[in-house]
Swiss-Prot record:
Lineage: Eukaryota, Viridiplantae, Streptophyta, Embryophyta, Tracheophyta
Record SUPFAM superfamilies: Mannose-binding lectins (SSF51101)
Entry protein name: Jacalin-related lectin 5
Pfam families: Jacalin
Biased composition (Polar residues): 275-307, 366-375, 388-416
PROSITE patterns according to UniProt: JACALIN_LECTIN
Species the sequence originates in: Arabidopsis thaliana
Length: 730
């Protein structure tokens, strides 16, 4: 059944029910007293979000699948001008997106539903200017193609209507053209320009067809993740099954030959008579190849040959020293030359993790981690000193797991990898933390000739982080960096850092078996960015880039069609910055791993706490913060009929710690928060909001700081909660 909420001032609240698919959506709007009807039927899980007065939705995307009764949406993610909500539901193979045009917002939804949500689209209106709230209802996303269900275009006409360029879950009419048609069945003689996740018409051409089955004699220009037509030509086909007689021009993302030759049909199965016209990446970073270092390293920087690529060793010392071969992913190292002289000491390294010899100095451990060589420590010129650590002098730690590098084998028994910088490198050169993430992609390096990071531009797509760019500052001048990855149809979000008072201190992220970074978040000494991409629900590996008392001045990593991995360069916070606001101390959240991540960041004060109880534990929390004299409120979880209990902090007092009671409750996918208690500097203790359990954790920073903000995970209940702490003098 088709439905249409119409156009309103702005979206106020969205509530979803779901299980294996999205069962229903219900939306509240500003500018009307009427509440939207639930569109669909009730699911087993309920979740949603409420927008602040100056927040508006700019995009909705998700996944769908085809069942015996037609297409159904399996997941939804909502992007606003401030953050991302979701993913709600389950990611499947077919992706779609409905994005508002530039400087517009979504002001209403329409679509179709039955036992589940079958399709969804949006009405658009101009976004309010900065500093204002509300907007005038504007053009609709309803297309002029009556054969489509839930269409959104990008070509608004003067009368507020638009051509059909996106058709999520609908069917294409027998004649005419459709633009981007995710999930549609394109039949007849009409020309399908873009058909994401649908089937190709028997005649005509298909343009960009991610996940589609392109059959017939039409020419497929781009087929991302789909199958190649039996005849015709395939253009860029990353990860596709390229069969038949068509020639494959570019296939990105597969295996690389060890001899230094370019990738041959990476990630694809090239069958039939297809001719490989172009292979992307001509021996880049020697992924899977062999590495040789046959020359001598005479105590200075060396040049190494990675099966066709050239690397530079910046550190002094013999073979196996600090600057020798920082990263060789998937390859094997052969050192057939002797080390040069370094104050009379010679060092001969090998790829088995043996220790070189250095009279009067401690030899470094040369460790080959899963084919990736990290020179752990290096040749020291300080007699009697032992250099054991990472190539940059830091010691990697894994708070949620154990990481052992001593024998050349990497073991990570937890879900998170962290480089937090226990410093042993005292020189002034930038400290390099190796790239974290998946394998593959082309190596890039923005370098270190910067004073800091000014802007970060992030584009997120259906498979993870598509593209990233960093703008740096040098001597007060902005230096725009290059793009890494390829931007899709979605928008780009920008983080601005107010140099020099503000500087970047850490990055947290998530990657999985797709070898693509799935989500990422940045923290400065003053703020924490929104979380970009997919949340952590127990699958994949979390990582962190951070060095104590240092700031980030540059990035490096690997990227191709997406961002595969990310590393960073750190330098000490300068004396001129030492008097600036130190970064807040983010103390780990206690509780379970399920739920949507929230991160309020750090404020000047926490003025009031609201806690709402549910049937099994804490279902809802709300916090009144103060920043620069202005009040800001954040809420998480789902309010119940029980209402809330409150704890107000006096103006001359502050919270110093929080007790979190957690337990495993039947019906929930992980532990949940059962109760909370707060304590203040003046000795006040809040009531215990909830029921006491045996599993109690105290959240505090151990430095006498004051609690200045919260982070954690929530959906219909509060799954986990942690806090930010700042010096009490603030």
């Amino acid at each position: 059944m088709s439905w249409d909420d119409g156009k309103h001032t702005k979206v106020k609240r969205v509530q979803l029910t779901f299980d294996d698919v999205i069962r229903s959506i219900e939306v509240e709007y500003d500018g009307t007293s009427l509440k939207s009807q639930p569109r669909g039927t009730a699911g087993t899980k309920i979740d949603g979000f409420t927008l602040s007065s100056d927040e508006y939705i700019t995009e909705v995307n998700g996944y769908y699948k085809t069942t015996f009764s037609g297409e159904v949406i399996t997941s939804l993610t909502f992007k606003t001008n401030k953050r991302t909500y979701g993913t709600y539901g389950n990611k499947t193979s077919s992706y779609f997106s409905v994005a508002a045009p530039k400087d517009n917002q979504i002001v209403g939804f329409l679509g179709s539903s039955s036992h589940a949500l079958n399709s969804i689209d949006a009405h658009f209106a101009p976004a309010p200017p900065p500093g204002s709230t509300g907007a005038k209802p504007g053009a609709s996303g309803i297309g002029s193609d009556s054969g489509s269900i839930g269409s959104a275009g990008t070509n608004p006409g003067a009368d507020g209507t638009r051509e059909t360029e996106k058709n999520a879950g609908g069917s294409k009419p027998s004649s005419g053209s459709a633009g981007t048609n995710p999930g549609a069945s394109a039949v007849g003689n009409g020309e399908t320009e873009k058909n994401a996740g649908g089937s190709k018409p028997s005649s005509g051409s298909a343009g960009t067809n991610p996940g589609a089955s392109a059959g017939g004699n039409g020419e497929t220009e781009k087929n991302v993740g789909g199958s190649k037509p039996s005849s015709g030509k395939a253009g860029t086909n990353p990860g596709a099954n390229a069969g038949g007689n068509g020639g494959t021009e570019k296939n990105a993302g597969g295996s690389k030959s060890s001899s230094g030759s370019a990738r041959t049909n990476p990630g694809a199965s090239a069958g039939g008579n297809g001719e490989t016209v172009s292979n992307i990446g001509d021996t880049e970073s020697n992924a899977g190849g062999s590495k040789s270092n046959d020359g001598a390293n005479n105590g200075a920087s060396g040049i190494e040959s990675n099966a066709g690529s050239t690397g530079t060793n910046f550190g002094a010392g013999g073979t196996g020293g600090i600057g020798d071969t920082e990263s060789d992913a998937g390859g094997s190292k052969t050192n057939s030359g002797n080390g040069g002289t370094n104050d009379g000491a010679s060092g001969i390294g090998s790829n088995d993790g043996s220790t070189g010899t250095n009279p009067g100095a401690g030899g470094g451990t040369d460790s080959n981690i899963e084919g990736t060589e990290n020179n752990v420590g290096g040749k020291e010129t300080n007699p009697g000193a032992s250099g054991i650590g990472n190539s940059d002098g830091s010691t990697g730690t894994s708070p949620e797991g154990t990481e052992s590098n001593a024998d050349g084998t990497k073991t990570n028994t937890g879900g998170k990898e962290s480089n937090t910088g226990s410093e042993s490198n005292t020189n002034s050169s930038p400290q390099k933390l190796e790239a974290q993430g998946g394998n593959g992609g082309n190596q890039w390096d923005d370098g270190t000739d910067h004073d800091g990071v000014m802007k970060i531009h992030v584009a997120v797509g259906g498979l993870g982080i598509e593209q990233i760019r960093f703008d740096y500052v040098k001597n007060g001048q902005l230096k725009e960096g290059p793009f890494h990855g390829v931007k899709g149809r979605g928008g780009t979000s920008t983080i601005e850092i107010s140099h020099p008072d503000e500087y970047l201190v850490s990055v947290e992220g998530l990657y999985d078996s797709s070898n693509i970074i799935q989500g990422i978040q940045f923290q400065s000494n003053k703020h924490t960015s929104q979380y970009f991409g997919y949340e952590y629900y127990g699958d994949g590996t979390q990582f962190s880039l951070q060095v104590n008392e240092k700031k980030i001045i540059g990035f490096h990593g690997f990227a191709d069609s997406h961002l595969n991995s990310l590393g960073a360069y750190f330098v000490p916070i300068s004396s001129s910055s030492s008097s600036l606001t130190p970064p807040p101390n983010k103390v780990k959240a206690q509780g379970g791993s399920y739920g949507e991540t929230f991160d309020d960041g750090a404020f000047d004060h926490v003025r009031k706490v609201y806690v709402g109880q549910g049937d099994s534990g804490v279902a809802y929390v709300k916090f009144d913060y103060e920043k620069d004299g202005k009040k800001e409120t954040q809420e998480h979880g789902k309010m119940t009929l029980s209402g809330t209990e409150e704890f107000e902090v006096d103006s001359d007092d502050y919270i110093t710690s929080m007790e979190v009671y957690v337990d495993k409750v039947y019906g929930y996918k992980s532990e949940i928060v059962i109760a909370l208690t707060f304590k203040t500097f003046k000795g006040e203790t809040s009531p215990r909001f909830g029921i006491e359990t045996e599993n109690k954790y105290e959240v505090k920073d151990g430095k006498g700081g004051k609690l200045a903000g919260f982070h954690g995970k929530a959906s219909d209940v509060l799954y986990a909660i942690g806090a930010y702490f700042i010096p009490a003098a603030n």
